[in-house]
């Protein structure tokens, strides 16, 4: 079991007292960038509870975000499904199961609006060889500020697909990987 709390200032753009853009670079090279420094605050709190016994592992993770000003980005085009307001949350479960040469693991999460899931099934027919399939589904309206996951896009949002892979080491110092993404 673990928990956390954070209170920090963030960079961004304020328009009429509302956050319209959040900058994550941390760079302040010019006066224009310096003017966007520490304009609002964010508080985070959350935790994780995990259980493991023999071949099974289960966990629950939650995070709650609060901005001191409302977040109201311009909602046009691809960003029309982004979140807005000043309070957000994400709740997820993670799971894993191993049995002989098989393993299954994944995580499923939900937010204020959408959901996301990533699952992997792996089989090792012989020592040094692995076959795997990774399934992902990230709904168009899912949002998690600190999420990073396997996928084609840079955001954990609006994507679904399957990744198939074979990995083997037939000889010493040889490592062969073949994969494709559907």
Roles of regions detected by a PLM:
Residues 1-29, 38-40, 44-48:
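Aromatic- and glycine-enriched pocket-lining scaffold segments that form the walls
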Residues 1-13, 74, 78, 101, ...:
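Transmembrane beta-barrel domains of Gram-negative outer membranes and organellar outer membranes
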Residues 23-28, 72-79:
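Flexible, solvent-exposed loop segments that connect beta-strands
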Residues 34:
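Conserved catalytic alpha/beta cores of large enzymes that bind or transform nucleotide phosphates
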Residues 38, 42-73, 80-182:
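Exposed, low-structure sequence patches enriched in small/polar residues
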């Amino acid at each position: 079991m673990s928990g956390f709390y954070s209170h920090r200032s963030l960079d961004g753009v304020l328009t009429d007292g509302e956050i319209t853009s959040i900058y994550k670079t941390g760079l302040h090279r010019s006066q224009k960038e310096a003017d966007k420094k520490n304009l609002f605050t964010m508080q985070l709190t959350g935790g994780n509870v995990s259980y493991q016994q023999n071949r099974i592992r289960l966990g629950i993770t939650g995070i709650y975000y609060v901005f001191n000003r409302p977040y109201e980005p311009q909602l046009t085009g691809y960003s029309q499904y982004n979140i807005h307001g000043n309070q957000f949350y994400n709740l997820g479960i993670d799971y894993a199961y191993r049995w002989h040469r098989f393993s299954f693991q994944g995580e499923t999460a939900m937010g204020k609006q959408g959901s996301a899931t990533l699952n992997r099934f792996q089989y090792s027919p012989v020592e040094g060889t692995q076959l795997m399939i990774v399934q992902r589904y990230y709904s168009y309206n899912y949002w998690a500020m600190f999420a990073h996951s396997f996928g084609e896009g840079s955001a954990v949002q609006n994507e679904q697909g399957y990744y198939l892979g074979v990995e083997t080491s037939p000889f010493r110092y040889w490592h062969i990987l073949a994969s494709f993404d559907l």
